[in-house]
Regions:
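A beta-strand edge to alpha-helix "cap/lid" segment located at domain peripheries
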Residues: 1-4, 50-142
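Short, low-complexity N-terminal intrinsically disordered segments enriched in polar/charged residues
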Residues: 1-26, 30, 131-142
């Protein structure tokens, strides 16, 4: 099982690194639930999870994980990373330090994902313009 969990986490990172929505979609069980950030209305089911991807990858947006660390225990995994969010339209961005918790089923699909981050884990790179984000707005992404 450890290999299935590690593969799911590795491919999750790869999907973001390559801006690959198809790979991202393939990682999730059809009935999965994804809460990002914790406290937001969860995305329930593959269509809602893919809509979340679209929300974060609007025109000109890229999200690249760096400083990635994983911990695997049984069928669960922790992914710790810095998500470098960049908007090429206006050269703005931010870095979000995240801790994601995933539960993987026997088929190797993610059934539950929870992303832990808040205003205190957001930092501003010095070489680009600030990207304003308000957690409450993010939670109400509709």
């Amino acid at each position: 099982m450890k290999e299935k969990v590690q593969s799911a986490l590795d491919n999750y990172v790869l999907a973001y690194m390559n801006n690959d929505k198809s790979l991202f979609r393939s990682l999730w069980d059809d009935e999965a639930v994804f809460e990002d950030p914790v406290g937001a209305e969860p995305c329930k089911g593959i269509e809602a999870i893919c809509a979340f991807w679209d929300f974060g990858h609007a025109e000109g947006m890229e999200i690249k994980p760096t400083n990635v660390e994983t911990i695997i225990c049984a069928n669960e995994g922790i992914l710790k990373a810095v998500m470098e969010v960049r908007n090429s339209n206006d050269n703005s961005g931010m870095n979000i330090a995240i801790v994601d918790h995933f539960i993987i089923n026997d088929a190797g699909k993610i059934v539950t994902g929870r992303a832990f981050w808040n205003e205190d884990t957001i930092s501003q790179p010095t070489d680009i313009k600030s990207m304003d984000i308000f957690i409450d707005d993010f939670k109400d992404r509709g």
